[in-house]
């Protein structure tokens, strides 16, 4: 599906029901971000926040009652100024995204940092999760230099595309619109597996 806007400037001129969250982890070279958080891609914000123990975090969250899809800016177009500044301040970046597949719990691991992507994929598999390293030519590979996650000091980052079914499996009440999602044991196991790869 095409984005409604082609830049953050265009989006912010027409939309107001969103919020931007940035929490600095002093001295950390790591940042974890969710450019499609809140109601844009449900479950992404919770995953990002789970990394605040050792990472700076950035979230762009949709807050609309409906049609949060209009707040979606594809990662290579995601040029929100604070995100650009803060990702560029860090050496390592990991972005969580959600893709639509309500049947198969799965994670597509990509980004220009292929070495760490392979490591995260292996750690997820070892923890019992279905995950695969994206082909660099795949639509969701996340290797484009303009992708927000690759705009680090090292000019590379990591992108995790998590299916609807996998996100659903990580919470007791996924899809409940008016309540905070309650994380389950699987959530903790998933996050721990990603951390083992990312923090190495």
Curated annotation (Swiss-Prot):
Organism: Bacillus subtilis (strain 168)
Gene3D superfamilies xref list: Poly-gamma-glutamate hydrolase, zinc-binding motif (3.40.630.100)
Record's protein name: UPF0714 protein YjqB
Family: Belongs to the UPF0714 family.
Top-level division of the source organism's lineage: Bacteria
